Amino acid sequence: MGNSRNKRGKREANRQRTVEALARAQSGADTGAALQLPQKKFYRQRAHANPFSDHQLKYPLSPAHMDWASHYPAFENPDPAQTNLGGFRKLLKDVEVVDIGCGFGGLLIGLAPLLPETLIVGMEIRIQVLDYVNTRIQALRTQQRHFKLKSAGGGGSDAAPESPAAPPTPSEAASPDSTTPSEQQAPTTLVPGGFQNISAIRSNTMKFFPNFFGRGQLSKIFICFPDPHFKARKHKMRIISETLNAEYAYALRPGGLLYTITDVEEYHHWILRHFREPEVDGAVPCDDGADGIKELFERVSDEELQQDPCVEVMREATEEGKKVSRNKGNKYVAVFRRKADPEWPA
């Protein structure tokens, strides 16, 4: 028991040192060039959280009451009169991309330079994991600001290049030799957008997803390596269901994409059934919801997916994706396009 308290104290002390170092770098008292990113081992938490428990979450009354400006200060509307129903400053653009169950933020970091002008948010229910992600993002933003200042002022030899370097390819990011250093050391070059376009919030998607996003607001939704909940009595906890798919369809604009990836073949077939894809392996569609889901989504062909760089990031840049690659496991990808709303009969 005493050893457990000692380990917990060490983790808390390390997290505090990380926060203090970040605060010094943000204030300009310390350089951000060698800023260390937080380490996952000091942000330990259970792998799963019960979505049906009362987690005492804070959530907006409606999308118009959400405080997005605190998450994306670089995109804050400069006009102080531009506020939403919650009294918070509006943004110059809306959040368009969501990573449901973002975990330790690998997909957010991978997508940030790929979509530098698009606001991306991760949704995570676990407190310690969310704390890690946001600390990591703040550290990356701080280092990028230092690099930009040094580049503009012709700083010393440790200054970043004047032009943003191309981000590493997903396969390079997923190499086993790069996973450990990349967690500890921030990037050494400028990246497009400077990670100002990503953030993460604590939320229970199964309960409060429509409280954050309005109708047709999103262009992409990612669900990467979700908890498979193998036991039949826990299937109701799966993040893919016809009920939830209807909510995703509400928030996705026509033509928007919903990306899914899992390393569990049974879950992959579950996903296909709940998006009404019975032709795959002779699967029979489920009967737990309305047939209207089939009218809202269509599956994207493999030929189209080969041209989508987001698919490669989803496969190789996430922490779970890297682990599956190291274990030489299979990855099952399915992407669905939001159809235009059907017309009402005359």
From Swiss-Prot:
Main location: nucleus
One Pfam family recorded for the sequence: Methyltransf_4
Composition bias, Low complexity: 171-182
Highest taxon of source: Eukaryota
One term of GO molecular function: tRNA (guanine(46)-N7)-methyltransferase activity
Pathway(s) it belongs to: tRNA modification; N(7)-methylguanine-tRNA biosynthesis
E.C. numbers: 2.1.1.33
The keyword tRNA processing appears for this protein: yes
Binding site for S-adenosyl-L-methionine: G101, E124, I125, N204, T205, C224, T318, E319, E320
Localization (cell): Nucleus
Region of interest (Disordered), residue spans: 149-191
Catalysis: reaction(s): guanosine(46) in tRNA + S-adenosyl-L-methionine = N(7)-methylguanosine(46) in tRNA + S-adenosyl-L-homocysteine
InterPro entries hit by this protein: SAM-dependent_MTases_sf (IPR029063), Trm8_euk (IPR025763), tRNA_(Gua-N-7)_MeTrfase_Trmb (IPR003358)
Entry's family note: Belongs to the class I-like SAM-binding methyltransferase superfamily. TrmB family.
Subunit structure: Forms a complex with trm82.
Name this protein carries in UniProt: tRNA (guanine-N(7)-)-methyltransferase
Source organism phylogeny: Eukaryota, Fungi, Dikarya, Ascomycota, Pezizomycotina
Gene name linked to the record: trm8
